[in-house]
Regions:
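C-terminal low-complexity, glycine/proline- and small-hydrophobic-enriched intrinsically disordered tails
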Residues: 533, 537, 655-853
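Protease-associated
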Residues: 79, 83-89, 94-171
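Residue patterns forming the tRNA-binding/recognition surfaces of aminoacyl-tRNA synthetases
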Residues: 1-83, 142-146, 152-154, 167-370, ...
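Conserved phosphate/anionic-ligand binding catalytic regions in large, soluble enzymes, centered on
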Residues: 4, 72-91, 295-296, 300-302, ...
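Amphipathic alpha-helical
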Residues: 5-39, 109, 113-135, 140, ...
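Alpha-helical recognition segments enriched in aromatics with Gly/Pro capping
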Residues: 50-52, 147-149, 153-165, 176, ...
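Secondary-structure transition/capping motifs at alpha-helix termini
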Residues: 7-12, 152-153, 189-205, 279-285, ...
Length: 853
C-alpha cells in the first residue's frame, strides 16, 4: 500500500461509492450478500417544476408545500434529448414522496431515490431524507410541469405501465422522437385516452426532432416501432431491442438537430448539454447502484458521494499497462479474456479503505483499515519467501534466517521484490537478504493463478493492475485461469436442499483416487463443473479393473509373444505415444477432463483394439509393458495413489512414480502420422461394415414382411464380403477441390464463395446436386484439419495393404467365411458388385458388398 501511495496510484477525494448506511462505510464486493460486481451508475437528475397540480394531488398534499418550489425529478442517461420533451411519465401504482431538498425546494421521487440523494448532498440532511407527504402515482396524473430545455415549455404528467420503483427516481421524462418506450406509450394513451383516464389534450404534443441518424433519420423511435412491428407498450421484448438499437445509433452516429449544439455529434454534445443544464440549476448529477446491493448486515446499499482513499484503477496510463499484461498473459479461454477486458473497461476508482472490520491499518492514515480486496493482490509473491521468514503457519516463530517482522521494512521489500537498491540501513545480514531475493527471483513470476470466475471483477483484475504497478515486466504473471462453480449431480450445491458434499465425505465414500477421477471428469473452464455420483461409483470399478489388467499382463504367460514388431504392433505403439503427447498438452492447458479422456479412455480403447486385432498371434510382451508404464504415468496426476501402487508393486519400477519422468519418446523418435491414420481407418472401416450389414438386415426384415426375396441373408451359414477400394476420387470432386484451392486465401484462411460459384458455373458443375454439399463438407475439413491436408486428398498409407492385414479380424468379428479386398477396376472386371455400388467407393471410404457364397 505504501508503494502504491508513493506511485500516486492511491488518491484521496470526493467520489461515488457503494455505501451501507447501516454499517456507516463503503460496501465493497466481499462485504455484500447480494449485488457483487455492482457499481454506481451516474444519471442526470432533471428538475421539472410543478406549475399546476392535478386536482387529486392538490387535495392529497394540502398545504405542506406552501412557500416552496416543487420539482418532479427524473433520472435520465440522455440529457441531450431534453429538447424534445412532450410529457412526463409516472407509475400509477407507485408511491412517491415529497422530500425537502433544502429551504426552498421540494423533490418528488421514490423513497429509494431520495435515500441515494441524501448521501450525495442533493437532499439535506445528509443521511435522513425528510418526507413531507406521500402520493400515489395515479394522483399526480394531469399535473402540469415545466420541461427544462424543451421546445415545449410546459407539459403534462401521464401514466406509464413500465415505470419501476427499483430503478431511477420513478419519474420518467418523455422524448418520443428518440425513445421507443416513450413513443409506444404516447400512442397507447392517444388511442385509449378514456381507458387511461386522461384528457386527450394532455397527450396532444407531437414528437420533436432532436437528433438525426444515418439509419433512422430524425424520428428514430417511430421508425423502429414501425420496423419491428411493435403494437403497444406491452411488447416489452421488442421494445428492449428497439431501445438498444436507438441508443447505439443515436449516441455513436447521431448529430444534434436542435439547440445550441446543432450539427455537433451526439457523443460530444451530450456532456455539454448536461453541464449547461446543471449550471442553469435545471438539473444535477445523480447516481445510484446499477443493481440491487445488500450488505452482509442486511442493509440495502446506496451510492454515496464522499471523501475517501481510493485506488485509481481506470487511470489511462495504468489501464494501458494492465491491458498490455492481459494481452500477453494466458487466460486459457476466450471467455475469460473477454471477462477481463470487460472489467478493465468499467473498473474505476476503487475505495481501498474502511472504518472498521478486519484488516491492516492504512499506514499513512491509521484511522482507516485497508479494504479486504485491496491488499490481497500480490500475496503470491510472499509465498516465495515465507518459508525463510517464519517456521510455522501463523508466522509467530522466526524462520531459518532469524528475521523478525519489524526488520522487513519497505526498503527491504523493495530490494527483495522490486530489484531495488541494497537497503544500507537494514540490520539484516547481506547474505540473508540475497537468499530472500534469490528465492523470489527463482519462483517468480507465478506460472498460473487459478481462481473462481466470480473474482475476475475484483481480486484477479486488481492483481493485474497491482503487478504492473509494482513489478518489472519479467515478474508479471504468466497466466490466470478462472473456473466455474462445482455442481453436484447437475444441481447447485446447497445445505438447505441436502444436495451438498464435503471433500472428506467424498473421500470416505469413494476413496481419494476415485474422487479425483470424478472431479477431473466434472469439467474445466469458466462454465460450472458437475460432480456426478455415478461417475465416482464407476471410477472405483474402473480403477480396480486397471489394477487387474496391469497385474495380469505383468505376470506374462503364453498369450504374449516376443520378436520383431508387426504392423499392428507399430500402429498401437504410435497411438499411445501420440496420446501421451496429447495428454501432456491438455495437462499444460489445465484441461483435466480432456487429459482424462486421452490418458485413460482413449488409451484403453487403443489397447482394446490392439488386443482384438492381434487375437491370432497375441500381443507383444515388450509393447504391453511399455504401454502399462506409459498409462500409469499419464494417470499419475489424477490418480496418484493407484498409479504409485501399480508403478512400484505391479510393474516393479524403481523409485516413486512422483519422481519419474514424463513418457516422452527418445530424441531419435520420428512421428509416423501414417500409422495413426491407418489405425483410425481400420476402426472406421470395420464400423462402416457393421453398419452396412445392419442396414441389410433391416432391409431383409422389411422385404420378408412384404413377402419379397432378399439379396443377402445375414443369418445364412456362409457369408462373405467384397471390400472395393478406389485409387482416385471422382472427376467432379477433383474439379471442385481444384476450384476451391484457387479461391482459397492463405492470409485470411477463407474461401471466396463468389469465385467458386463463378468457376463452377463456367464448367457447368452447378447443376450437379452433389457439388455444394461436398464443398460445404470440405470447408468444415479446412477448419478442422487445415487447408493443406484438405487439398492434398491423399492417403498416408496403402489402403489395400492395410485392409489385407485386417482380413483375419474382419472374418472373426463379422463371422464371415471369406473377405476379398479388390480395386474398383478388379471389381468391375469380375462383376464382384453392382456398378452403382462400385461407384460409391472413394479413397479412404471403400464400397462394401455383402453376399452369400
Amino acid at each position: 500500500m505504501n508503494r502504491l501511495h508513493d506511485l500516486d496510484k492511491i488518491k484521496f477525494g470526493m467520489r461515488y461509492t457503494i455505501y451501507s448506511p447501516l454499517d456507516g462505510q463503503p460496501c465493497m464486493d466481499h462485504d455484500r450478500s447480494e449485488g457483487e460486481g455492482g457499481g454506481p451508475t451516474e444519471y442526470t437528475g432533471i428538475k421539472m417544476e410543478v406549475v399546476q397540480w392535478s386536482k387529486a394531488a392538490l387535495e392529497a398534499i394540502g398545504n405542506v408545500v406552501e412557500g416552496k418550489k416543487v420539482f418532479l425529478v427524473a433520472a435520465t442517461l440522455r440529457p441531450e434529448t431534453m429538447y424534445g420533451q412532450t410529457n412526463c411519465f409516472v407509475g400509477t401504482t407507485l408511491d412517491y414522496g415529497l422530500f425537502s431538498a433544502n429551504d426552498e425546494e421540494i423533490y418528488v421521487c421514490s423513497y429509494r431515490a431520495a435515500r441515494n440523494m441524501a448521501f450525495q448532498d442533493i437532499i439535506r440532511p445528509r443521511d435522513n431524507p425528510v418526507k413531507l407527504a406521500e402520493l400515489k402515482g395515479s394522483l399526480i396524473i394531469g399535473t402540469k410541469i415545466k420541461a427544462p430545455f424543451s421546445v415545449n415549455p410546459e407539459v403534462y404528467v401521464l401514466p406509464m405501465e413500465g415505470v419501476l420503483a427499483s430503478k431511477g427516481t420513478g419519474v420518467v421524462t418523455s422524448v418520443p422522437s428518440d425513445s421507443p418506450d416513450d413513443y409506444a406509450t404516447l400512442m397507447d394513451l392517444r388511442k385509449k385516452a378514456e381507458f387511461y383516464k386522461i384528457d386527450p389534450e394532455w397527450a396532444a404534443l407531437d414528437p420533436v426532432p432532436v437528433l438525426s441518424t444515418p439509419t433512422y433519420g430524425e424520428m428514430t423511435a417511430p421508425v423502429l416501432i414501425k420496423q419491428l412491428k411493435i403494437q403497444s407498450q406491452k411488447d416489452t421484448v421488442r421494445l428492449a431491442e428497439a431501445k438498444e438499437l436507438a441508443y447505439k445509433e443515436g449516441f455513436y452516429k447521431g448529430t444534434m438537430s436542435i439547440g445550441e449544439f446543432k450539427g455537433m455529434p451526439v457523443e460530444e454534445a451530450k456532456p455539454r448539454v448536461r453541464q449547461k443544464m446543471i449550471e442553469a440549476g435545471l438539473a444535477f448529477a445523480y447516481a445510484e447502484p446499477d443493481r440491487f446491493v445488500k450488505s452482509r448486515s442486511g442493509d440495502e446499499c446506496v451510492v454515496a458521494l464522499m471523501d475517501q482513499w481510493y485506488l485509481d484503477y481506470g487511470e489511462e496510463k495504468w489501464k494501458a499497462q494492465a491491458e498490455k499484461l492481459l494481452e500477453r498473459m494466458n487466460t486459457y479461454s476466450s471467455e475469460t479474456k473477454h471477462a477481463f477486458e470487460a472489467v478493465l473497461n468499467w473498473l474505476n476508482k476503487w475505495a481501498c479503505a474502511r472504518t472498521y472490520g478486519l484488516g491492516s491499518k492504512l499506514p499513512w492514515d491509521p484511522q482507516f483499515l485497508v479494504e479486504s480486496l485491496s491488499d490481497s493482490t500480490i500475496y503470491m509473491s510472499y509465498y516465495t519467501v515465507s518459508n525463510l521468514l517464519h517456521s510455522d503457519m501463523t508466522g509467530s516463530k522466526p524462520g531459518p534466517l532469524g528475521i523478525t517482522p519489524d526488520q522487513m521494512t519497505d526498503e527491504v521489500w523493495d530490494y527483495v521484490l522490486a530489484s531495488g537498491p541494497f537497503p544500507s540501513n537494514s540490520d539484516i545480514p547481506k547474505e540473508s537478504l540475497q537468499k530472500l531475493r534469490h528465492s523470489f527471483d527463482y519462483f517468480y513470476p507465478m506460472d498460473i493463478r487459478s481462481s473462481g470466475k466470480d473474482l475476475i471483477p475484483n481480486h484477479l483484475t486488481f492483481a493485474v493492475y497491482n503487478h504492473v504497478a509494482l513489478f518489472p515486466e519479467r515478474h508479471w504473471p504468466l497466466s490466470m485461469r478462472a473456473n466455474g462453480h462445482l455442481m453436484l449431480n447437475g444441481k447447485k450445491m446447497a445445505k438447505s436442499t441436502g444436495n451438498f458434499l464435503t471433500l472428506r465425505q467424498a473421500i470416505n465414500k469413494w476413496g481419494t483416487d476415485a474422487t479425483r477421477l470424478a472431479l477431473a471428469d466434472a469439467g474445466d473452464g469458466i462454465e460450472d463443473a458437475n460432480f456426478d455420483d455415478t461417475i465416482a461409483n464407476a471410477s472405483i470399478l474402473r480403477l480396480h479393473t486397471l489394477i487387474g489388467w496391469c497385474q495380469e499382463s505383468a505376470d506374462g504367460g503364453s498369450g504374449y509373444r516376443t520378436g520383431d514388431f508387426t504392423y499392428h504392433d507399430r500402429v498401437f505403439q504410435e497411438e499411445f505415444i501420440n496420446l501421451a503427447a496429447e495428454t501432456k498438452r491438455h495437462y499444460e492447458a489445465t484441461n483435466y477432463k480432456d487429459a482424462l479422456k486421452s490418458a485413460l479412455y482413449e488409451t484403453l480403447m487403443a489397447r482394446d483394439w490392439y488386443r482384438e486385432v492381434t487375437f491370432e498371434e497375441g500381443m507383444h510382451s515388450d509393447l504391453v509393458r511399455q504401454f502399462n508404464r506409459t498409462l500409469v504415468l499419464l494417470m499419475a496426476p489424477i490418480t496418484p495413489h493407484v498409479s504409485e501402487h501399480i508403478w512400484t508393486t505391479v510393474l516393479k519400477e524403481e523409485g516413486s512414480i512422483q519422481t519419474a519422468l514424463w513418457p516422452d519418446p527418445p530424441a531419435s523418435y520420428q512421428p509416423c502420422p501414417d500409422l495413426i491414420a491407418a489405425g483410425q481407418y481400420m476402426r472406421g472401416t470395420l464400423k462402416t461394415m457393421r453398419d452396412a450389414e445392419i442396414l441389410l438386415m433391416k432391409k431383409k426384415a422389411k422385404k420378408g414382411a412384404q413377402g419379397g426375396p432378399a439379396a443377402y441373408d445375414p443369418a445364412a451359414e456362409k457369408k462373405a464380403v467384397n471390400v472395393i477400394v478406389a485409387n482416385r476420387f471422382p472427376a467432379w470432386q477433383d474439379d471442385s477441390i481444384e476450384i476451391m484451392q484457387r479461391a482459397y486465401d492463405e492470409k485470411t484462411g477463407t474461401i471466396d464463395d463468389a469465385k467458386v460459384k463463378d468457376e463452377l458455373a463456367a464448367k457447368g458443375l452447378l447443376k450437379d446436386k452433389r457439388i455444394m454439399p461436398f464443398i460445404q463438407l470440405q470447408k468444415k475439413r479446412i477448419a478442422q484439419l487445415g487447408a493443406a491436408s484438405t487439398f492434398r486428398r491423399q492417403l498416408l498409407f496403402s489402403e489395400v495393404e492395410v485392409l489385407k492385414l485386417l482380413i483375419p479380424y474382419i472374418k472373426k468379428n463379422l463371422k464371415l467365411t471369406d473377405v476379398s479386398v479388390m480395386t474398383v477396376e478388379e471389381a468391375r472386371s469380375s462383376s464382384a458388385a453392382p456398378d452403382t455400388l462400385i461407384e460409391q467407393s472413394e479413397p479412404g471410404s471403400p464400397a462394401i458388398n455383402f453376399y452369400n457364397p
